[in-house]
C-alpha cells in the first residue's frame, strides 16, 4: 500500500496496480495519444480505491536533471473514471502520491494540457505550484505537439 486516508467516513487507498485489477475506463479527451511508441524506462502504476471501488489510475516515472541520484525527480499523472471527477478524490490522490514520492526525491512534478483547467486546479489543491508552460512538449493523436503546464512540489 502506498497511502491510505479516511475522509468523511470514506476510505481512500492508493496501492500498486496488479494485472488482475478491473480498472474502469478512466480515459478522457486529454488521453488521445494515438498509436505512438511508449517511452522506454521504468513506469510505476497504482490504482485509486474508494470504499473498495477502483475509481482511477496513477503512474509515475523518474526524471533526471543531472547525473547524480540527488538530481532525480518524479513525474506523475492521474486518470479518474468520469463519474468520480469533481468530487475531490483526484486532488486527494495526487497529494497522497506526492507525499509518498517526496520521501525518495526532493522534487515531484506533474504536467497537464494548457486547456485542462480542471486538472490545473486539482494540482493546486494538492499542493503543487505552477512553474510555467512547456511549449510543444507533448505529441497527441491529432499529430500536433501540445503545450503543457508544469506543476511541482518540493520538500522545502
Specify the residue positions occupied by each region the protein language model found.
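Acyl-donor (CoA/ACP) binding surface of acyl/acetyltransferases
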Residues: 1-21, 45-156
Amino acid at each position: 500500500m502506498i497511502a491510505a486516508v479516511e475522509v468523511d467516513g470514506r476510505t481512500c487507498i492508493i496501492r500498486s496496480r496488479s494485472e488482475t485489477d478491473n480498472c474502469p475506463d478512466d480515459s478522457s479527451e486529454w488521453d488521445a495519444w494515438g498509436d505512438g511508441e511508449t517511452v522506454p524506462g521504468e513506469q510505476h502504476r497504482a490504482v485509486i480505491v474508494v470504499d473498495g471501488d477502483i475509481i482511477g489510475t496513477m503512474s509515475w516515472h523518474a526524471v533526471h536533471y543531472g547525473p547524480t541520484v540527488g538530481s532525480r525527480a518524479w513525474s506523475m499523472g492521474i486518470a479518474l473514471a468520469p463519474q468520480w471527477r469533481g468530487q475531490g478524490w483526484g486532488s486527494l490522490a495526487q497529494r497522497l502520491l506526492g507525499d509518498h514520492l517526496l520521501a525518495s526525491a526532493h522534487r515531484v512534478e506533474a504536467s497537464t494540457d494548457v486547456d485542462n483547467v480542471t486538472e490545473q486546479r486539482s494540482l493546486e489543491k494538492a499542493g503543487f505550484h505552477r512553474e510555467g508552460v512547456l511549449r510543444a512538449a507533448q505529441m497527441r493523436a491529432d499529430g500536433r505537439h501540445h503545450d503543457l503546464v508544469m506543476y511541482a512540489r518540493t520538500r522545502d
